[in-house]
């Protein structure tokens, strides 16, 4: 018996592959992190089979390389994601995102009275991990929120 293994999303020659994104989160990452703000080709795989997650999303961006800081910000939404840098169709660097200390300009503060919602300032949160949970503290209103509360509003 032979197995024909085919890529479900076309390989890229050079660029970034964000893999192991939880299903239904891929589009949110594209929007929040402004990954579509490029003229380069972007390929998206949604609800792909995954041995580890059951189902996953996948994003491939040609000729763009995410920085370590950008990759780490993805950990807020996709803690198990991997960010692979591709050159000549080969993985030349693999980043495993870790929670950053701060995240700026991506999330929206859930506090409706926070100035970041009405003034022309970039949102800014400090990120804390406590008892296995992630908490985000807004720089402006100084309120602390569980990760899910912030992610729902963003």
UniProtKB/Swiss-Prot annotation:
Coiled-coil annotated spans: none
GO molecular function: metal ion binding
Subunit structure: Contains catalytic and regulatory chains.
Family statement: Belongs to the PyrI family.
Species the sequence originates in: Pectobacterium atrosepticum (strain SCRI 1043 / ATCC BAA-672)
Lineage, highest ranks first: Bacteria, Pseudomonadati, Pseudomonadota, Gammaproteobacteria, Enterobacterales
Protein name listed in UniProt: Aspartate carbamoyltransferase regulatory chain
Xref: Pfam families: PyrI, PyrI_C
Needed cofactors: Zn(2+)
Gene this chain is encoded by: pyrI
CC cofactor note: Binds 1 zinc ion per subunit.
Family matches, as InterPro entries: Asp_carbamoyltransf_reg_N, Asp_carbamoylTrfase_reg, Asp_carbamoyltrfase_reg_C, Asp_carbatrfase_reg_C_sf, Asp_carbatrfase_reg_N_sf
Keywords: Metal-binding, Pyrimidine biosynthesis, Zinc
Binding site for Zn(2+): 109, 114, 138, 141
């Amino acid at each position: 018996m032979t197995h024909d293994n085919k890529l479900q999303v076309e390989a890229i020659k050079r660029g970034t592959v964000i893999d192991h994104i939880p299903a239904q989160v891929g589009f949110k990452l594209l929007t929040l992190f402004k990954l579509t703000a490029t003229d380069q080709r972007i390929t998206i795989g949604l609800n792909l089979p995954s041995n580890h997650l059951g189902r996953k999303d996948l994003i491939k961006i040609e000729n763009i390389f995410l920085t370590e800081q950008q990759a780490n910000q993805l950990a807020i939404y996709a803690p198990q994601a991997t960010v692979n840098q591709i050159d000549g169709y080969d993985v030349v660097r693999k980043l495993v995102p870790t929670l950053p200390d701060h995240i700026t300009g991506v999330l929206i503060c859930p506090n409706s009275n926070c100035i970041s919602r009405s003034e022309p300032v970039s949102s800014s949160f400090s990120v804390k991990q406590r008892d296995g949970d992630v908490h985000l503290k807004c720089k402006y209103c100084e309120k602390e929120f569980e990760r899910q509360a912030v992610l729902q509003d963003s």
